[in-house]
């Protein structure tokens, strides 16, 4: 999780929804004292895990959030639950899904595609 929310709020949400074993980490903007879409926010997981930004999938239901992650170089996924039109921004997401269950097939497809490149 990478959020503008406070650590206390984020941990409470994760714990109260029994998602403790789902997420490896929770990153809050409080760690860098600045809000998204500042690049320092998106740098946090990159630095911690020593990975390239194009190896990260970033998903959100908020268009500005998807744009920020995508502009940083993350693979952006817009969760469009309401079949809305993407805001008039200078960025369009890589992929659009209607619900989180679609994420499973998206990840599986990417996993299978990675074998084709070996």
Where are these regions (language model features)?
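Asp-based, Mg2+/Mn2+-dependent phosphohydrolase catalytic module
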Residues: 2-7, 11-118
